[in-house]
């Protein structure tokens, strides 16, 4: 099996150390140990056995997730982050010759990973002109007898647009009618500025998520699959061939903080995200010669369309070389002419980064 490189990851890993301003990473500032202990009043007892594993997931985390998703433990597979969660869903559903339908623009691993198994990608465009909304009629026309899986993110990565429950229900109904499943990666959903329930419980829907993006707990690498039991059984069996078990201490710590302080973590996120969004919105309104954009419905990423005649990779490399500013090329999300901006840093850092972005664009404009 040949594993293609994920351009987005390579771009971030190679260039982040050289950037003074970072609008590329898509997670909120992490929770500190001091914050964790203040929120949970928990620390490991001295006799805690660090040799423990939980192949079927820590009961404490499963109980917490049952409460969040109103599900049973049979509906849960705990994983090492959302990446493993998605990997297990793809590997349990797709074989060579199968087709999967994937939103575009989208998050690169969500099509490169299933292609590892010989599955054929069918692009499902989400168009800038329609504010990156999902087109249900188009989806219906894309489904064939070879279709096994429909894949989308909610909130949409890279635009931050929310797919509302009415649209998700329509997608689920199509999937049920055609006997296929829908994978909804909800890693950003708790960061929505508008109330939006999880898609779990709708027919033929599989949900994945993790504690990384919204909660500021990326170091735990705690993820999960929430799905009908026939799916979780398959994914649990496949997990024995991947990590075997996620980190038990990480799952315990995730369970305590989500159980005790999930709403506080969401408020922490929303405070930062809404403040920064207003700053970004004001900045965008003053940069119409350079950008058009669809305002995100939450999260901390957006996907503006730029007006300059330059490839997205060349533009981002220019900004890195001249301004020490790191942003992500739209081509890595399969949409040329755009960049993905993240705004989860602190407010002063965001303002400085936006100032650098404006300087870079004006300098480039003078050269063209």
Language model segments and positions:
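N-terminal small-domain helix-loop-helix segment of the aminotransferase-like
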Residues: 1-81, 88, 260, 368
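Conserved glycine-rich beta-strand-loop-beta hairpin in the small C-terminal domain of fold type I
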Residues: 255, 271-281, 292-306
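Active-site PLP attachment segment
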Residues: 201-234, 247-249
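Structural signature of PLP-dependent enzymes
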Residues: 235-242, 258-281
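PLP-dependent enzyme catalytic core of the Aspartate aminotransferase-like
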Residues: 318-327, 333-368
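Helix C-cap/helix->beta junction micro-motif
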Residues: 117, 177-178, 203, 323, ...
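Active-site phosphate-binding strand-loop segment of PLP-dependent enzymes
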Residues: 128-193
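PLP-dependent aminotransferase-like
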Residues: 92-152, 173
């Amino acid at each position: 099996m040949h594993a293609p490189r994920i351009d987005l990851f390579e771009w971030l890993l190679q260039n982040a150390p050289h950037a003074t301003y970072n609008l590329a990473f898509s997670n909120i500032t992490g929770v500190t140990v001091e914050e964790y202990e203040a929120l949970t009043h928990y620390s490991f007892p001295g006799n805690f056995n660090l040799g423990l594993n939980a192949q079927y997931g820590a009961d404490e985390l499963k109980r917490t997730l049952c409460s969040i998703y109103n599900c049973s433990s049979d509906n849960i597979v705990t994983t090492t982050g959302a990446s493993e969660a998605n990997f297990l869903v793809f590997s349990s559903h797709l074989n060579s010759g199968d087709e999967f339908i994937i939103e575009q623009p989208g998050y690169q691993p969500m099509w490169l990973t299933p292609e590892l198994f010989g599955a054929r990608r069918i692009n499902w465009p989400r168009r800038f002109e329609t504010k990156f909304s999902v087109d249900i009629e188009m989806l219906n026309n894309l489904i064939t007898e070879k279709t096994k899986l429909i894949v989308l993110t909610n909130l949409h990565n890279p635009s931050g647009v929310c797919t509302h429950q009415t649209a998700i229900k329509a997608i689920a109904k199509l999937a049920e009618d055609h006997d296929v499943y829908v994978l909804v990666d909800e890693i950003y959903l708790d960061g929505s500025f508008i109330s939006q329930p999880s898609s779990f419980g709708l027919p033929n829907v599989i949900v994945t998520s993790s504690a990384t993006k919204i909660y500021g707990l990326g170091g735990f690498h705690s993820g999960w699959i929430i799905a009908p039991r026939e799916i979780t059984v398959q994914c649990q069996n496949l997990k024995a061939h991947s990590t075997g078990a996620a980190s038990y201490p990480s799952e315990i710590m995730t369970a305590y903080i989500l159980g005790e302080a999930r709403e506080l973590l969401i408020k922490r996120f929303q405070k930062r995200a809404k403040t920064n969004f207003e700053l970004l919105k004001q900045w965008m309104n003053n940069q119409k010669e350079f950008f058009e954009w669809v305002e995100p419905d939450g999260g901390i990423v957006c996907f503006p369309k730029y007006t300059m005649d330059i490839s997205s990779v060349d533009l981002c490399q220019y900004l890195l070389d001249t301004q020490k500013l790191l942003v992500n090329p739209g081509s890595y999300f399969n949409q040329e002419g755009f960049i993905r901006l993240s705004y989860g840093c602190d407010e002063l850092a965001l303002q400085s980064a936006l100032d650098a972005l404006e300087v870079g664009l004006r300098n480039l404009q003078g050269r063209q």
